[in-house]
Amino acid sequence: IDAEGDKCTNAIIFCNRKMDVDTVAKSLKKHGYDAAPIHGDLDQSQRTKTLEGFRNGDLRFLVASDVAARGLDVPSVSHVYNFDVPSHAEDYVHRIGRTGRAGRDGKAVMICVPKDEKNLADIESLVQKEIPRLENLLKSAKSEESKSETEAGKEDKKYTSRTRSRRSSNKSND
């Protein structure tokens, strides 16, 4: 979101599950972004209030489930972020159809992890177009940071010895 700067005037962020919609909206608010959730478990008055705030520009980020997005009429959405790859390729078309309306420019971004590759392939098959990939910037930043720390560590430990101990590699399923 930050990388887009002023180009991102407003955005809809899609999640596959209502629980994730709430979590993402809460996290964005915690980090200073003007965001609110919209999904079927919210009462109609709350959904109407949230949608009206998004339409009139009082709310910059709308975090939504697919069901909430169907029939959503917001004439000017600059960005769509797919927090999750949709399980059904048709949902992707509905999601990205929220941006770039009436001849306006719009941008859609999707976060895809290896377990979502099949769904991504289904989407590309449906739209008959390969979706461009961006380098994993977070992974690259960590790699550069690690490289810098390693170089700094070599300088700091020039005259010390290191011992290695073998540790168990129990991985948790986060």
Residue ranges and their predicted role:
Residues 1-142, 164-167:
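Conserved helicase RecA-like core
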Residues 142-174:
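Arginine-glycine-rich low-complexity intrinsically disordered regions
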